[in-house]
Each structure stands twice: as C-alpha cells, then as structure tokens.
A protein has these predicted regions:
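Short S/T/G/P-rich N-terminal loop/turn motif that feeds into the first structured element of a domain
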Residues: 1-49, 53-68, 74-89
C-alpha cells in the first residue's frame, strides 16, 4: 500500500520552498513510485506532504535529489505512515 511522507521544515520560507520545488519539479514527476506532492505553511516554517508507492522510493528520491538541493542548515523532520486508502479523481 502507498505511504504518506510528512516533512516539517523549520525555518523554511515560501520563497525557499518555491526555489527548491522549481528545481525539482520535473524530476519528481518522473520519479519511480511518486504519486502526489502538497505543501502548506506551518507554525515554524513549511510543511511538505507526499504520497509514494513505497517508503524506499520516497527515501531514494529524498537522498539523491532533495537533500543535495536543500539550503545549508535546512533539515526536514520526516515521518511516514502507511496509508489505508487513497482515492483520487
């Protein structure tokens, strides 16, 4: 079953997030196992939510693409949940 990756990014701004996602958008759309990506402001920065086919695919994408693109000092707090159900339009 699919997984939900949640990342809290303390200190991240909308502008900082936008620069990162602009650089990664094309790649994530083609990433094995990627289903969807959403974001929202959080109390102390920015929150990112992604749905992936597996935790391994999410971790591989993060390690090879996201981590190297993050500004120095920005360290997301990532958590994973196995999803019971995903319904799309």
């Amino acid at each position: 079953m699919a997984i939900l990756m949640s990342a809290e990014v303390p200190g991240q701004t909308q502008e900082g997030y936008q620069a990162t996602v602009d650089a990664l958008r094309e790649g994530i759309m083609k990433a094995p196992g990627f289903i969807m990506h959403m974001t929202a402001p959080s109390e102390d920065g920015w929150a990112v939510f992604e749905v992936w086919e597996s935790k391994k695919e999410a971790n591989d994408w993060f390690a090879h693409n996201v981590a190297p693109a993050l500004p120095e000092g920005v360290t997301p707090r990532r958590t994973f949940r196995e999803l019971y159900n995903v319904i799309t339009a």
